[in-house]
Amino acid sequence: MKNLNLISFISLLLIMSFYRCDKQSDEFISDLDTTSFVEAFLAFVFDQDVEELVDDAFAQESYSSKTSDISTSGISAKGPKRNFKGDRYGKCATITVDEENNIKTVFFDGECFGKRGQTRTGTIVITYSETKGEIGSFRQVEFDNYFLNDVQIEGVRRYEVIGIEEGVDKTIQMTLENGKMTYPDGSFSTRSKSITKYISYEGEERVSTSVTGNASGVNSDGSAYDMEITSPILFTKECAKELMHKKGKIPVSGVKRIVKGETEMIINYGDGECDFVAEVTKDGVTETIDLKEIKRKRKFRKLKS
């Protein structure tokens, strides 16, 4: 009789254990996938990276006296060949200037390792206006087989100055058409956007960038989304070195709203502290995340799909 009771008790424990495991498995499966968030985040910081690189391409004053004739991936450029100051984007990153046609071409000859640990390959072609730093002046950026951290970047980006304050600080309208990011696993996301950037300077040095605007597109899982910045997203020079990371420049504050169908997600980048922390809120539940660590195709711990 005692043996029978013992067997029954053990059987009950096993049943409860299986039930608990199944329940935990169901809860894990229902946890919200991080892919949409990470793709939106990468798109945002990669744009900042491209903009900074383009600014640096225009900031280089010294170049070799030799005229180069370079051809990479079907794109050729003839003109003075320059290097980025301090090999910031790797020793194999060079700039050629076609002053007659107002074109700068940035070549990454092989896999170039930058100061932040980022890798780049391919070509960036920058067309620019005759005027610089004035209302109406512009830069247009296109890519040829360009990869940043093994993610292929495509699309046409246009930056146009629409306002100047005190002769220094600028308001820039940025648009993206046919934007596409292809990930190492072959999946891709698409997007278009229109944003406004207010850039504050001290002398010729950028102190901060405040970003507003919206975007829309399709994630790699095939779901359409809309993004709106509801509180300006801020990047600062003060935190730039502390927040250096291979994913790109990390914002210190600002809020954006992402809507997929009937699902809404709020991302809060903080209140100005120099950290990698952000808060993601869905259905009234908030999860704190580390922007250095989060990756695509993982699960949030608290947020449910």
Q: Across the structure, where does each feature detected by a protein language model lie?
A:
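Bacterial Sec-dependent N-terminal signal peptides
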Residues: 1-30
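Low-complexity, intrinsically disordered segments exposed to solvent
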Residues: 23-305
